[in-house]
Amino acid sequence: MTNTRKTHPLIKIINHSFIDLPAPSNISAWWNFGSLLGLCLAIQILTGLFLAMHYTSDTMTAFSSVTHICRDVNYGWLIRYMHANGASMFFICLFLHVGRGLYYGSYTYFETWNIGVILLFVVMATAFMGYVLPWGQMSFWGATVITNLLSAIPYIGTTLVEWIWGGFSVDKATLTRFFAFHFILPFIIAALVMVHLLFLHETGSNNPSGLISNSDKIPFHPYYTIKDILGVFLLILVLMTLVLFSPDLLGDPDNYMPANPLSTPPHIKPEWYFLFAYAILRSIPNKLGGVLALVFSILILMLFPLLHLSKQRSMMFRPLSQCMFWILVADLFTLTWIGGQPVEHPFIIIGQLASILYFIIILLILPAVSLIENKLLKW
């Protein structure tokens, strides 16, 4: 009798994706983040669903409804903080996942990589809109500042901003539509994840060496299911430690004040995971230039396959590229730090230098170093 797992039309798809999938035998813990991102998405959708049952998207009651969730709903505080800190875990996993892709040359799978970059954009948009929903001071002013950036687009900018706002300022219409989009986007993300996996399974996974591993594959289950479960436990441990011991560690105290259009907070800043992009935006004095730099700081990821000039795929055997990669990581940490600082000396110049270095490393230094390493191979 044939196995149902291999013949049933629906279970067969799951079997080929998570059970009998041939996987390289040498993939390290850096390959765990895909499954962890799936877990993060599931946590966010579930906690978000329960929050949406009690939340009201009206400027008069939004802040109170979040307070009500935390005080009166059974385990509402837990659901709310799991959702807020779950977003932070989501972005930590995202950054590590993208970093892994850059280090080991996974971007040579064009379709998988490009869908991944689109996913990054959509997740960032979703997180931004979610941050607006509690309707605290930072929610309101963050929404005002970031949506206002679109006014830098020539000719249609101002009209576009008013169209997004649904009026002449961030108000009830803006909050309602942000809630609607914040609810629907995670499901669009889930659909894009399916496409991401579809393209990945066309080629098979990359591995640390960057070499073709078809001659040495092992089944995904039980080897990598067990390995993923370890990652899952570690992620939940970190998330729940954060949620139960210091849930507001990564948040902004200003968001515990209800939104007030008449009082601007001293330092408007986004959540920590957007600070690097915010620092790049602020480091350019021109509004349109800043917006372009902001968009290009993420969009530049799509150029990596074109800028890959090395004869080797992975950085595993390329010490010079490794060195530049870690300088880039340090630069991103610097940008994140600067994004949270006030706009004054010496932070302005540090931010500008870090922004220039970010683009120079990616566009010039990494490709140049790759060519040098190609020459060194002939020694």
Swiss-Prot record:
Keywords: Electron transport, Heme, Iron, Membrane, Metal-binding, Mitochondrion, Mitochondrion inner membrane, Respiratory chain, Transmembrane, Transmembrane helix, Transport, Ubiquinone. Changing I360T: In strain: Isolate S60. Binds 2 heme b groups non-covalently. It is a multi-pass membrane protein. GO terms for molecular function: metal ion binding; ubiquinol-cytochrome-c reductase activity. SUPFAM superfamilies: a domain/subunit of cytochrome bc1 complex (Ubiquinol-cytochrome c reductase), Transmembrane di-heme cytochromes. It comes from the Eukaryota. InterPro entries: Cyt_b/b6_C, Cyt_b/b6_C_sf, Cyt_b/b6_N, Cytb/b6-like_sf, Cytochrome_b, Cytochrome_b_C_euk/bac, Cytochrome_b_N_euk/bac, Di-haem_cyt_TM. A ubiquinone binds at H201. Heme b b566 binds at H97, H196. The chain crosses the membrane at residues 33-53, 77-98, 113-133, 178-198, 226-246, 288-308, 320-340, 347-367. GO terms for cellular component: mitochondrial inner membrane; respiratory chain complex III. Its cofactor is heme b. The cytochrome bc1 complex contains 11 subunits: 3 respiratory subunits (MT-CYB, CYC1 and UQCRFS1), 2 core proteins (UQCRC1 and UQCRC2) and 6 low-molecular weight proteins (UQCRH/QCR6, UQCRB/QCR7, UQCRQ/QCR8, UQCR10/QCR9, UQCR11/QCR10 and a cleavage product of UQCRFS1). This cytochrome bc1 complex then forms a dimer. Heme 1 (or BL or b562) is low-potential and absorbs at about 562 nm, and heme 2 (or BH or b566) is high-potential and absorbs at about 566 nm. Belongs to the cytochrome b family. Component of the ubiquinol-cytochrome c reductase complex (complex III or cytochrome b-c1 complex) that is part of the mitochondrial respiratory chain. The b-c1 complex mediates electron transfer from ubiquinol to cytochrome c. Contributes to the generation of a proton gradient across the mitochondrial membrane that is then used for ATP synthesis. This is Cytochrome b. The lineage of its organism: Eukaryota, Metazoa, Chordata, Craniata, Vertebrata. The gene is MT-CYB.
